Amino acid sequence: MAFGASELATKASRLFVVIAVARMLSPSEIGIAAAALAMGDILKALTENGVGQRIIAAKDHDLEGTCTTARRLFWFWCLGLFAVQVAVAALFWAIGGSVMICLLILVLAGEYLFMPAGLVQVALAMRAGKMRSIAAIAGGQVVISNILSVALAIVWPAAIVLILPRLLTAPFWLMAVRRLHPWQGNPNAHPTAIRPFLTFGWAVLGIEVVKALRLQADKLLVGLLLGPQALGLYFMAFNAGLSLASSFSVALSVVLFPHLCASKDRAASLRQGITLSLGLIAPVVVLQAVLAPWYVPLLLGDDWAQLSGVVSILCLAAIPTVLWTSAASWMRAEGRPAQELKATALVTLALMLNTFLLAPLGLTAIAWGYLLVSCIAMTLAALPALNAAFLSATKERLQNA
């Protein structure tokens, strides 16, 4: 509930950003920012390496040692990602890429310098059940970032208004999480072995990278195949259509995994999670899809009215997305990250192939393909979880009757 309220607040503030950039920036400028954001988000997925989840799942007597090892891994990993992103920007510039995109990628890299000093505290806070406070911090950071984006768009209408606030709000996040759950580490604690982190983390890391590709690779393909203007239109359609569902899915994955880990009846908890999440999101996105022809030109302006059909289609893709998010959390809680990785990779490849094949037909064709592929691929990938949550429980009740 806390994460849901947080996402509602962030989406409300994000709406003002969408309205501002639609009126202040050209589709090409938005497309340039979208390309940088897509590249940055794919690289940022590498921070989701399962280290924090090892802290959440650690036994009490191993906690200090686990945190000590985790802190070292976080620093090593984030500094490495900073270097990689700087190298990507330099390489992109060297091969003749847009100077503005290079600068935007460099700005996004600055986030990695703040993250490692607070990631252990975040995991410990989640372990302690401080979900409401974590949600408030995450939501507060995004709201402040969105307010800054609107202010910058008014005084400095350029692509960087969608990027710079991420870096400017990173210190707020760091100070807040360190204050929420202070932890300095015990110098006498014996660090746990790194191998368990690697054994668990490789699959989780692969999952998160593939998940980021599922969310962002189509945007890069649209930019490469159709140009920055088409990417700007596609990016705005996604923000107006699937943005709500994407945020809800992120919040759901954050809270459902620890809930399933702690549950004595995992099947019942999964069944409750699927039923509740679909019950909440499905009516909202259906209404959103129906109203898109009215609210898109009203909010974004008449110049963007052509996007209303694409927005309506993409709204409906939220339903299979939320179903798959619940199933993926169950697989991870069951210790099946490799199965989740395989399923996520297949879904991602299907969506990328859809974009590549339908790009010549335009954005509406891509959107219809995205919806169809999402419904089929994500439902098939979620079948093991659906079986555990519903069919197995039904069989057990019939046997006991």
Feature annotation, model-predicted:
Residues M1-N49, V86-A89, N146, T199-Q229, ...:
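Signature of the first transmembrane helix
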Residues M1-R14, A36, A45-A90, L103, ...:
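Membrane-water interface segments that mark the loop-to-transmembrane alpha-helix transition
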Residues I101-A109, A135-W183, F238, V347-A350, ...:
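Hydrophobic alpha-helical transmembrane segments
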Residues R132-I137, A159-R166, P171-L215, V255-A268, ...:
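Interhelical loop/hinge segments that connect adjacent transmembrane helices in multipass membrane
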Residues P27, G31, L91-L108, V290-V322:
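Interfacial segments at transmembrane-helix termini and the short loops linking adjacent helices
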Residues R54-L63, L113-A138, A262, L316-L346:
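Membrane-interface junctions at transmembrane-helix termini in multi-pass inner-membrane proteins
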Residues M1-S13, C67-T69, M100-I101, P191-V204, ...:
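N-terminal membrane topogenesis motif
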Residues K44-L63, M126-R127, A237, G241-D265, ...:
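Helix-loop junctions and terminal segments of transmembrane helices
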